[in-house]
Swiss-Prot record:
Note: The active site is at the interface between 2 subunits. The proton acceptor Cys is on one subunit, and the charge relay system is on the other subunit.
Phylogenetic classification of the source organism: Archaea, Methanobacteriati, Methanobacteriota, Thermococci, Thermococcales
Coiled coil: none
Cofactor(s) the record lists: Zn(2+)
Annotated catalytic residues: C31, H70, E140
Keywords linked to the UniProt accession: Lyase, Metal-binding, Zinc
Protein encoded by which gene: queD
Pfam families, A to Z: PTPS (PF01242)
GO MF annotation, one: 6-carboxytetrahydropterin synthase activity
Keyword Metal-binding attributed: yes
Protein name per the record: Putative 6-carboxy-5,6,7,8-tetrahydropterin synthase
Catalytic activity: 7,8-dihydroneopterin 3'-triphosphate + H2O = 6-carboxy-5,6,7,8-tetrahydropterin + triphosphate + acetaldehyde + 2 H(+)
């Protein structure tokens, strides 16, 4: 008797990075102040092998982390860019920060949930048609993380 089998392929990647942020909250919290984390990102990508024999190039993941590492992460809704500066107005703060020290994300807040979503979207931008699922987990500390899963579906031809 011959057996038929189906291969399901995944890659897994993880890296730590250091970044600072603050949150916009309706209630009082120390997290409204600028603070930092040694984040850990975990990525799992499911798909088929591409022409090079890979599901996804790990280098693309490292580039996303490099963009975030040792930078202040802020919401697009809070900033105004003036020349080489980013002016951030939020929580009774006005900060002027050199543009190259800031990552502006197109999310309403800089929570672990939104950061995981942003990271997943960046991966999806580089994903080939061979990618089926992207899972991103962002750890803010050893006890807490946020996770998102993207299911990619081909759009028309």
């Amino acid at each position: 008797m011959t057996m038929r089998y189906i291969i399901k392929r995944k890659i897994y990647w993880t890296k730590e990075f250091d970044s600072s942020h603050f949150l916009e909250l309706e209630y009082e919290s120390k997290c409204k102040r600028i603070h930092g984390h040694t984040y850990k990102v975990e990525v799992e990508i499911e798909g088929e092998l591409n022409e090079e024999g890979m599901i996804f190039d790990f280098t693309h993941l490292s580039e996303i982390v490099k963009e975030l590492d040792h930078r202040l992460i802020v919401s697009k809704e809070w900033v105004k860019e003036v020349g080489d500066l980013v002016i951030i107005e939020k929580n009774r703060k006005i900060l002027k920060v050199p543009r190259d020290e800031v990552v502006i994300i197109d999310k309403p807040n800089v929570t672990a949930e939104y950061l995981a979503e942003w990271f997943g979207e960046r991966i999806a931008e580089n994903a080939g048609s061979n990618i089926k699922k992207i899972k991103v987990r962002i750890w803010e500390d050893p006890r807490s993380y946020a996770e998102v899963t993207f299911t990619l579906e081909p759009q028309g031809s």
